[in-house]
Design a protein with these regions (language model features):
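C-terminal segment of classical bacterial N-terminal signal peptides
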Residues: 18-28
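Low-complexity, intrinsically disordered terminal/linker segments enriched in charged
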Residues: 165-203
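Surface-exposed, polar/charged faces of alpha-helical domains
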Residues: 32, 50, 54-60, 89-93, ...
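Short beta-strand edge/turn micro-motifs at domain boundaries
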Residues: 147-175
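Early exported N-terminus immediately downstream of N-terminal targeting peptides
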Residues: 33-110
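Short, low-structural-confidence N-terminal segments
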Residues: 26-36, 141
Length: 203
């Protein structure tokens, strides 16, 4: 458990899940295929490792990681989930501003930690259909870390197949972020606009 807490503090594993996913389009009536989810996890994992292992300048690498994140993570679903009940009283304009701010917040918080994932490996164990999409169970191997069991939750609710959550040794990414966002909102007396503005300034 100490290891997991340290990883959460360092923020290096959580964001990796955002990139181990896929973007194939599917129809509403077409079930998300487990094999496709698994193959695309391997594909995107390889892509990200190529980025972080390159000799390019740090700003270039961060920019490339941000681009991948925007493509493969369902930030709209993630943002609304982390906002919690407050989303029901927010206007459409407020929600759009929050979703944009949440994406910036996530990029600033996690993308630059990808250097710590260099030479890491992911092993796919199993996958299974779940109510909201597909759950892919993996084991993540990193240098100087004990292996971790990581679950990636993939959905096509947005019209594209994207990652929307990750669970690391029982610790739920969205639940953790929801608590943190909730505290930030409470500290701002429930002011969603102020929360959104603040998210853009967090490194």
């Amino acid at each position: 458990m100490k290891l997991v807490k340290k990883i959460l503090k360092n923020s290096c594993i959580l964001i990796s899940a955002i990139f181990f996913t896929n973007v194939n389009l599917v129809t509403v009536s077409q079930a998300l295929e487990q094999s496709k989810a698994e193959e695309l996890i391997k594909k995107i994992s390889f892509e990200v490792n190529n980025i972080i292992s390159s000799s390019r300048d740090e700003p270039v690498i961060i920019g490339e990681l941000e681009f991948v994140f925007k493509k493969y993570a369902d930030t709209n679903i993630m943002a609304l989930t982390t906002l919690g009940p407050a989303r029901r009283i927010a206007s459409a304009t407020q929600l759009e501003f929050f979703k944009e701010s949440f994406q910036i917040y996530f990029l600033n918080k996690y993308a630059r930690r990808f250097r710590e994932l260099k030479d890491g490996e992911i092993s796919i164990l199993t996958s299974r259909p779940i109510r909201s999409g597909v759950e892919v169970k993996t084991r993540v191997h990193l240098i100087d870390w004990a292996p971790l069991e990581v679950l990636w939750l993939v959905s096509d609710r947005s019209g594209e197949v994207k990652i929307f959550n990750i669970i690391i040794d029982g610790i739920n990414l969205l639940s953790s972020e929801r608590v943190e966002i909730g505290v930030m909102l409470e500290n701002r007396n429930g002011d969603i606009d102020l929360l959104s503005a603040s998210l853009r300034d967090i490194d």
